[in-house]
Design a protein with these regions (language model features):
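Short, structured segments at the rim of ligand-binding sites
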Residues: 1-361
Length: 361
């Protein structure tokens, strides 16, 4: 399907928009809900990842296909490793079968899990034979995708003696680890995160909880970009958000000040308003703690004629697609001068915008 987008004469906008729940929070809570009775969740994400995870958790099939859903693949690997007596094959799309899983599999094997590869070593599909995991200490590199670490954390309190995870080296995406721990704490799971060590105490049963998932800050990034690219006075109101968010992408509030966007909170509504035209010529950001918003920031910078250097993006190359390569390809069509490495992006300022271009999405 092709959609043609045309400019408008009046570029000042005022809108109210309801955003669905955070995918990151939703997926973590769904695993915890399956492990503990009495957890009721509202405002779940309507993302494909969350739908795939919900289906997998309710399925009795021997082969579970999670499509492109990387979070589901990682979280379910630990979940099914814990299900004593259950054997499943976890698989996914062609792209998913080229996304590494070995670091997580090795950590689970170190704890006593039984997992094997059905095809290529280190990649899905994987065969998991659920068993009682009795070991309670494991090491894993800190600079890997935080989803590996969160996957282990989510099952940790169900182990007989809990779990101690030692993170080796520099830790990537700490906000996502803290998000996992915060949600666990809300459910009564005791955790301690000091220096490079995370300790989780065992818990047989959580207290009954009604949890409202905060709306997704990553989704909010697109509306930040729209406001930044619009006339002064443009305003978008988004629901429902928390001023003290546990989502790393809430850093948008401070980042988009560079683009002339002011953020205010009114109850659970966040108000984005274009207050000034940005006079920035260059923007340099380390997005190690929030890499998923890099693409939106790059597009905003390009639209405003601002050069930018974005660092800490190494996890984007192993997503559902190589996001850095895809961004470079599509922005170049529009006239951007952009270069990428394994962990960074550099965009030169440019006032030229090519028209009548087809963008792959």
């Amino acid at each position: 399907m092709k959609i043609c987008i045309e400019g408008i004469e009046n570029n000042k906008i005022v809108k109210n928009i309801l955003i669905s729940g955070s995918k990151s929070e939703s997926n973590r809570l769904l695993i915890l809900q399956k492990l503990f009775d009495g957890i009721n969740i509202t405002n779940l994400s309507d993302s494909d990842d969350t739908h795939h995870l919900q289906h997998a958790l309710s399925s009795n099939e021997a082969i579970i296909n999670i499509g492109h859903a990387g979070t589901a693949m990682r979280f379910l690997t630990s979940y099914f490793a814990l299900k004593d007596g259950r054997e499943v094959i976890l698989t996914g799309s062609e792209r998913m079968q080229n996304r590494p899983i070995q670091i997580l599999v090795n950590a689970l094997r170190d704890l006593g899990a039984t997992i094997s590869y059905e095809a290529k070593e280190g990649y899905p599909p994987i065969r998991i034979k659920g068993t009682k995991i009795t070991k309670d200490k494991v090491q894993i590199n800190g600079n890997v995708s935080s989803q590996y670490i969160s996957s282990l954390l989510l099952i940790a309190s169900k182990l007989k003696n809990g779990l101690e995870i030692e993170l080796i080296g520099k830790i990537t995406s700490i906000p996502y680890i803290n998000m996992t721990l915060s949600l666990m704490n809300q459910l009564g799971i005791e955790t301690v995160f000091v220096n490079q060590i995370i300790k989780v105490k065992p818990l047989k049963q959580s207290k009954k909880q009604y949890v409202i998932v905060e709306s997704d800050w990553s989704s909010a990034s697109y509306f930040y970009s729209i406001v930044a690219l619009s006339e002064i006075g443009s305003e978008i109101r988004l629901s429902s958000y928390k001023k003290e968010s546990i989502q790393g992408d809430a850093i948008l509030v401070s980042i988009y000040k560079h683009f002339g966007v002011e953020t205010t909170f009114s109850g659970s509504t966040v108000v984005l308003k274009k207050v000034i035209q940005s006079n920035n010529k260059h923007l340099k950001l380390d997005l190690n703690k929030a890499p998923d918003i890099a693409q939106t920031i790059a597009v905003t910078s390009f639209g405003l004629g601002i050069s930018c250097e974005l660092l800490g993006l190494h996890t984007l190359k192993i997503k559902e697609t190589d996001r850095l390569e895809a961004l470079q390809k599509e922005l170049t069509k529009l006239g951007a001068h952009i270069s990428v490495t394994n962990n960074s992006l550099y965009l030169e300022s440019n006032s030229i915008l090519h028209a009548n271009i087809s963008i792959e999405t």
